[in-house]
């Protein structure tokens, strides 16, 4: 007889048999894979001892490809087929991609999504990212000589549902079981929280190759709560490379036209940037088709050329603190994440803003992968005690459209996830059997000023009087930040739902703009909402009155009918204007003018109900 093994939920059946779970930092410039071995999180090296894998894929033809260092080495001579910084393309449309002209490979638009033209054909960012993830998966399986149980993959804090879903799709294509997606700052907090047993409020300043994130986290007794986020998904070390390349070309007067020359200048710019981390000056040198670009570059020149980029990061930090209602002095420390934070001007700018030196006791290139590995180890059931609770937040409010084009927020901005929130709605017209739902994202009061996420329809609502149906709309945001919306008519049980997967995401600049607009137009939005609500109430009153007149108008005398008709005409005229108070006044006037009619209808209804019935039967 076969025996069933019973174990604690979430724990491996055999306490001596550990599941192999890894953390993956899928970065714009570099990617890493880490795992917990002998109780310590560490990054896994390749066969040459290198833990970093450049996030680069070169397509030679339909069958052959190079990934990582080999691809990067061939970038200068085959720039058109060497794809770097693909993370910037994840879940985006062509119009959203910044610095397209500086990219050495060709982007195309397919069905609203950006793709890349290569020697192997048209490739999506998901397919290209899958090549990188698969390489890291093979590295981990070779290290442990076994199959992986799963992986925790990190994403920027501001990745929205579409970008997160694209990351999960890439992982699935690479043969990985995704245990969870967590934000990069949260992963860094895990690594620092465990190593230092620190509690309090911290800022995680994460400047990677292609994205910048600032997160304000509260660490309390194993609970990691993100209380504010900000950043820029189109700002990173790559932009410092571009800025330096532009500066050198402007100083030397050189022109670059070919993709190979552009790639060569960028490679030289990156090398100079890295050298200036420790040196005060460096000789910039790039071999071009028409000769060579040579320039003696001082660190002060590099700092000045890239100061606007550094200032953008500090502006985002300042805004995140405002959102969290904190001052720089309220923080216990600042954690630096990402290889780009090695630049002296970054550390200096952060120290000047906060008035203290940032924490740098963990390798900024590795800290995100290490935190993801710790979380993966726990989700695999390898660490039963001391589990961490991770509380990320959603960046913009979620809601649905109501009558008049107004937004009813259901999940507020900065709500911690995972979460599920519900609200009841009803029908607008008598006999209504379907309800169209429009899911939106944003902070403004009018749908026209927010971002549309999805539309779906609840059908099969039993016909009943307007306002009688009870429809519960539930928003569920899972631990990966993915949204699903359901609507259920409580009486009949009919239900409809939608999983929200936007065709492409918002950049952090767009999110910041939406938030700023919501602040600057708050008074205007409030007035606009009041006007729309007044018009909706007026329309509802007119519909109800007309329905009553159609059904029981014979109860009225000529004078009574004339008074109501005149009052309805005044309300219709008022509703055409922009004076909310006047519309509200006309609505109340119609309500007063129909009070006697309502009483007559009620008496007539009671009389009909009692007609023909004997007293003893009541």
From Swiss-Prot:
Family statement: Belongs to the heat shock protein 70 family.
Signal peptide: none
Alphabetized PANTHER family for the sequence: HEAT SHOCK PROTEIN 70KDA
Matching Pfam families: HSP70
One Gene Ontology molecular-function label: ATP-dependent protein folding chaperone
NCBIfam families attached to this UniProt entry: HscA (TIGR01991), PRK05183.1 (NF003520)
Matching SUPFAM superfamilies: Actin-like ATPase domain, Heat shock protein 70kD (HSP70), C-terminal subdomain, Heat shock protein 70kD (HSP70), peptide-binding domain
Keywords: ATP-binding, Chaperone, Nucleotide-binding
Protein name: Chaperone protein HscA homolog
Entry keyword Ligase: no
InterPro entries xrefs: ATPase_NBD, Heat_shock_70_CS, HSP70_C_sf, HSP70_peptide-bd_sf, Hsp_70_fam, ISC_FeS_clus_asmbl_HscA
GO biological process, one term: iron-sulfur cluster assembly
Organism: Variovorax paradoxus (strain S110)
HAMAP family for the chain: HscA (MF_00679)
Record's function text: Chaperone involved in the maturation of iron-sulfur cluster-containing proteins. Has a low intrinsic ATPase activity which is markedly stimulated by HscB.
Nucleus among keywords: no
């Amino acid at each position: 007889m076969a025996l069933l093994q019973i174990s604690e939920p979430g724990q491996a059946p055999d306490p001596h048999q550990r599941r192999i779970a890894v953390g993956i930092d899928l970065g714009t410039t570099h990617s890493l894979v880490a795992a917990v071995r002998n109780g310590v999180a560490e990054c896994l090296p390749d066969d040459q001892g290198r833990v970093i894998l450049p996030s680069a894929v070169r397509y030679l033809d339909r069958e052959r490809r190079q990934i990582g260092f080999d691809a990067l080495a061939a970038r200068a001579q085959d720039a058109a087929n060497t794809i770097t910084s693909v993370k910037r393309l994840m879940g985006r449309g062509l119009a959203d991609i910044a610095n397209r002209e500086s990219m050495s490979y060709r982007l195309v638009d397919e069905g609203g999504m950006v793709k890349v033209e290569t020697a192997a054909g048209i490739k999506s960012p998901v397919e290209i990212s899958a090549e990188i993830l698969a390489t890291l998966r093979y590295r981990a399986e070779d290290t442990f000589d076994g199959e992986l149980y799963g992986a925790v993959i990190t994403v920027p804090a501001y990745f929205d549902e579409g970008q997160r879903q694209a990351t999960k799709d890439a992982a699935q294509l690479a043969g990985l079981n995704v245990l969870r997606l967590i934000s990069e700052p949260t992963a860094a907090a895990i690594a620092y929280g465990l190593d230092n047993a620190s509690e309090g409020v911290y800022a995680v300043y994460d400047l990677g190759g292609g994205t910048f994130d600032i997160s304000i986290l509260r660490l309390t007794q194993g609970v990691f709560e993100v209380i504010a986020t900000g950043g820029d998904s189109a700002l990173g070390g790559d932009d410092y490379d571009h800025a330096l390349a532009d500066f050198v070309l402007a100083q030397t007067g050189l022109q670059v036209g070919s993709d190979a020359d552009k790639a060569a200048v960028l490679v030289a710019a990156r090398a100079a940037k890295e050298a200036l981390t420790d040196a005060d000056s460096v000789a910039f040198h790039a071999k071009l088709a028409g000769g060579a670009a040579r320039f003696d570059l001082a660190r002060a020149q590099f700092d000045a050329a890239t100061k606007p980029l550094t200032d953008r990061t500090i502006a985002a930090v300042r805004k995140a603190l405002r959102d969290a209602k904190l001052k720089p002095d309220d923080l216990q420390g600042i954690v630096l994440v990402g290889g780009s934070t090695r630049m002296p001007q970054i550390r200096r700018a952060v120290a000047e803003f906060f008035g203290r030196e940032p924490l740098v006791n963990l390798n900024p290139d590795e800290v995100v992968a290490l935190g993801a590995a710790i979380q993966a180890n726990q989700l695999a059931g390898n660490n039963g005690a001391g589990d961490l609770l991770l509380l990320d937040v959603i960046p913009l409010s979620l809601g649905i459209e109501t009558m008049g084009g107004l937004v009813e927020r259901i999940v507020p901005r900065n709500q911690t996830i995972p979460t599920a929130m519900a609200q009841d709605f009803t029908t607008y017209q008598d006999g209504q059997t379907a309800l169209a739902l429009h899911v939106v994202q944003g902070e403004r009061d009018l749908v026209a000023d927010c971002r549309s996420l999805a539309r779906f329809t609840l059908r099969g609502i039993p016909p009943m009087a307007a306002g009688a149906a009870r429809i519960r709309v539930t928003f569920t945001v899972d631990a990966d930040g993915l949204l699903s919306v359901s609507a259920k008519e409580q009486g009949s049980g009919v239900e409809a739902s939608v999983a929200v997967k936007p065709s492409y995401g918002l950049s952090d600049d767009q999110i910041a703009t939406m938030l700023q607009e919501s602040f600057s137009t708050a008074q205007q939005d409030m007035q606009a909402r009041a006007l729309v609500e007044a018009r909706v109430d007026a329309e509802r009153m007119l519909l109800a009155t007309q329905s009553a007149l159609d059904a029981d108008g014979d109860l009225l005398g000529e004078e009574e009918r004339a008074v109501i008709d005149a009052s309805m005409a005044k309300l219709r005229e008022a509703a055409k204007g922009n004076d909310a108070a006047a519309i509200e006044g006309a609505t109340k006037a119609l309500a007063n003018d129909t009070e006697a009619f309502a009483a007559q209808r009620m008496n007539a209804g009671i009389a009909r109900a009692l007609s023909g019935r004997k007293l003893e039967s009541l």
